[in-house]
Regions:
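Short beta-strand element of the alpha/beta-hydrolase
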Residues: 72-78
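Bacterial N-terminal signal peptides that target proteins for export
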Residues: 33-44
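Serine-dependent carboxylesterase/thioesterase catalytic core
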Residues: 58, 80, 84-234
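Bacterial lipoprotein signal-peptidase II cleavage site
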Residues: 59-63
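C-terminal motif of bacterial Sec signal peptides marking the signal peptidase cleavage site
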Residues: 54-56
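C-terminal catalytic-base region of ester-bond hydrolases, centering on the histidine
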Residues: 212-299
């Protein structure tokens, strides 16, 4: 690895990947090629900037070590504003539940925390961030084939996740996706995104989330630039004009509406209620761990 200032920036991401590759690859040459590719890839810069911007390099690096990378990958995205509180709470819950995969907080925001409207309205910039996420997943799967990959997107971050799925190569699939209070048009055709998911896409929505997912997106628009209530309020509606192939993709969609029994888990039905550590521990982790006991897996 380079010893320059650039190396200091890249090492939190390159180091764990190279170390893990060394233990799994047949020879040193493959490791050297891996490191060189990551030096040249601007994806690395995007990943490390995301790691350092809010959470701090050490915090994200703690969940991106070689052992975790060898288990699998969970990528979590916050909503507009770039504070990344929700992904940190979710990460804590997943870790408490025994998830040993790498857990990466992908910071897709447009600058200083609090740029809510910029994050929401810049569709071209958001799609560029989504392409970066898609390439990140594809690079991970290239060097860790067969490991499980899960994507979690809350609110605006759910839009980035859907855009990323749509931007993936035709042969790329992730294992599962969680769209928590998605700030997307409820009539959006999800079939192109669903085609890149091997198992299921889980959607959570709440009729109590009316301020942000109702009034907010009706006024300022959804991530896909429709001025309407969002799927985070009412869920996704299945289009009526689907082809047979697209209709088969919709068999992967699982939608869970907020219910009063979630109160015992600290979920009051508000916008941030889907991002608590308790929700991650009780509802998301069982699916990531391959234990389909989570109520949302039966939706």
């Amino acid at each position: 690895l380079p010893s320059s200032g650039e190396g200091d920036i890249l090492s939190p991401v390159i180091g764990p990947i190279a170390s893990a590759a060394e233990s799994h690859a047949p020879g040193k040459r493959r490791v050297e090629k891996l490191v060189m590719r990551y030096r040249l890839s601007r994806l690395v810069v995007a990943l490390v900037v995301a790691a350092c911007a809010v959470s701090g390099c050490a915090t994200n690096a703690q969940y991106m070590g070689a052992e975790r990378l060898a288990h699998g990958l969970v990528v979590s995205l916050d909503g507009v504003g770039g504070y990344n509180w929700g992904p940190q709470w979710l990460r804590d819950g997943l870790n408490q539940a025994g998830v040993r995969s790498a857990i990466y907080i992908f910071d897709w925001g447009h600058g200083p925390a609090g740029m809510f409207l910029a994050d929401l309205m810049d569709e071209s910039g958001n799609r560029e961030q989504a392409r970066e996420l898609a390439r990140m997943v594809e690079n991970y799967q290239r060097y860790y084939p067969g490991r499980p990959v899960y994507l979690i997107g809350h609110s605006g971050g759910a839009g980035i996740v859907v855009f990323a799925l749509e931007a993936m190569k035709s042969t790329t699939q992730v294992d599962g996706v969680f769209l928590l209070a998605p700030a997307l048009d409820p009539d959006r055709n999800l079939a192109p995104a669903l085609a890149h998911v091997r198992q299921n896409v889980y959607v959570t929505h709440s009729p109590a989330d009316v301020a942000l997912m109702g009034l907010g997106t009706s006024t300022f628009g959804t991530m896909d630039r429709k001025h309407t209530v969002s799927a985070g309020l009412v869920g996704f509606r299945i289009p009526t004009n689907l082809s047979a192939a697209d209709a088969r993709q919709y068999a992967k969609l699982r939608q869970a509406e907020w219910k009063p029994d979630l109160l015992s888990k600290g979920n009051l039905g508000g916008h941030m209620s889907w991002t608590t550590s308790a929700f991650a521990r009780e509802y998301i982790a069982p699916i990531v761990l391959g234990r389909p006991a989570s109520p949302i897996s039966q939706a």
